[in-house]
Amino acid sequence: MKPKMITYADGMKYWYMNGKLHREDGPAIEWADGTKFWYLNGKLHREDGPAVEYADGTKRWWLNGKRHREDGPAAEWADGTKFWYLNGKELTEKEFNKVRLKKNLQDLIQ
């Protein structure tokens, strides 16, 4: 079953499947200004990049409906502000780097 695309007069496009935002081969929402949102089964989700890309350059990473990124900040605003999240939990940059270092060390040991 393929998602159904709805295009609005203002140029916005939305893909739905079973009443939920859903698209596996691209963003499920595309705004006329170029902003894009990736959804799977109604949840913000993207494994190979940010799940939200705003036209101004702001990027936000989500996985299974939770803010999440393991290799850097999960939110990078156009003004340079950054926020770190793992599994929906906000961390300071220092906390994030500590968790990342611990994971890297565990990977080396195994």
PLM feature segments, named:
Residues 1-110:
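Glycine/tyrosine- and acidic-biased, solvent-exposed loop/turn segments at the edges of beta-strands
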